[in-house]
Amino acid sequence: MADPVYVGGFLVRYDEPPGEAELFLPSGVVDRWLRDCRGPLPLNVNHDESATVGYVAGLQNVRAGLFCLGRVTSPKFLDIVQKASEKSELVSRGPPSESSLRPDGVLEFLSGSYSGLSLSSRRDINAADGAAGDAETACFKHVALCSVGRRRGTLAVYGRQPDWVMERFPDLTEADREALRNQLSGSGEVAAKESAESSAAAAVDPFQSDSYGLLGNSVDALYIQERLPKLRYDKRLVGVTARESYVKASVSPAEQETCDIKVEKERPKEPEQSHVPTESMSHPMSAVATPAASTVAPSQAPLALAHDGVYLPKDAFFSLIGASRPLAEAAGARAAYPAVPPPPAYPVMNYEDPSSRHFDYSAWLRRPAYDAVPPLPPPPVMPMPYRRRDPMMEEAERAAWERGYAPSAYDHYVNNGSWSRSRSGALKRRRERDASSDEEEDMSFPGEADHGKARKRLKAHHGRDNNNSGSDAKGDRYDDIREALQELKREMLAVRQIAPAALLAPAQLATPVASPTTTTSHQAEASEPQASTAAAAPSTASSHGSKSAERGVVNASCRVAPPLEAVNPPKDMVDLNRRLFVAALNKME
């Protein structure tokens, strides 16, 4: 049977509060739970109850925290560890030559693989106060060997002798060690009694797992975040620095420092070889790959001093860069600047070459230069001519000007700063427009704002294509209106030749008579009071004229009824034109 292995360490540190509330255990609660604890607690691997490897020989609540002393007794587990340690190159090297430790592959393998202790206890402190000491409601369930504990300061130290293990922790007093020895002897007597009772039958190994389960646990340990920084912090917190041990945590300083895990993450990497023997590692880590979960602090670049920099003007800086370009082409230069591309050579034009006729006249003057010169600046861009829409333009010409075609040889630049294009037939159409008769102008009446000014007619666009059928229909409608107005104009001219002698007498114009309204509805209302006056008037009009006077409208021949005009003659030419316009509107209706 293999020799047992003892493991010791703190399960709870009172000077280091945990980051999670469920892991907090006060000293008073620990004392109360220890009194209710019955029997030794099992010791397993990674809280796997099937991988029980021994038992907890002693639990002592000291000033620094809850200390545990366990014993690994499983032959199967120790045999697996022994075979695995023989395959490890790091373990096979043994302790350093200057160390007084004896080579022990099992202790070194356990110190590197299961470097922490973890206590399984009840989460609810209040509910655990009234719990009994049975296995179902016990306050402490078991202690596990793990890669790194969730509580800080729970570093595991392995050894073959219990006193040697307890001496690694400076926080334990002599009274604490004596109490642990008493618990260890009591648990040993209980274990001996149990082994004597089972001497008739083969002793059952508590380790029910296998090597595959241990391999799975080791793979899970690789994904623990910041495992090595936590182990370094735990080692300094516990104080396992001045005494040699098999702990595979990183190098710790010789003096005790204030522990802060947040500052520990930002510490620079410590040198692998130190001049102090107590600070050196038990085994060099040069041949071992760094685990995936570990983080290596990047090396900080030296800060630039004030006298390392020189201020230069921008022109001087660029001149230095330009002077260093020829040196960059030499062998071994650190940087090579790209060569400046030569300017493009212009094509040589031949006067007899038909393929070069599409080039403009400036291309005939270009010749390739003998030396590389900077490229010529681009020619100035001539703004496109702009011309307002000319109603005399054809559709094709107007579209060309609106799209902004460049001026051609048929254009000339006038003095007022605008472009003009000579079009065939333009002068002829301009003469026809200037010599147009009154028939091409819209009719205006006296009294209007634009009377006496020529107004252009609406031009019918009969020359458009079939796509402008809607515009042609609109032009035809304007032609009908124009013809009706021309007919009214001719009739009004005829009335002016006949009526002025009888209607525009000086005595009638001098008589202050109110001008009647020009609406047809008002004339109908005034027909009754004018009936008696119409009877006394001379009977020079026909019966048709008298009936029209009674109705208050103009007759079909545009001749004003004498009885109505005798009573209400027009006072001036404006009134006459208004009456004639009303008569024209009535005729159109």
UniProtKB/Swiss-Prot annotation:
Residues 307-326 are annotated as: Interaction with pAP. One of its GO terms (cellular component) is host cell cytoplasm. A motif (Nuclear localization signal 1) lies at residues 428-433. Residues 453-462 have a biased composition (Basic residues). This is Capsid scaffolding protein. Pfam families: Peptidase_S21 (PF00716). The record marks 127-128, 249-250, 556-557 as: Cleavage. GO terms for molecular function: identical protein binding; serine-type endopeptidase activity. Belongs to the herpesviridae capsid scaffolding protein family.
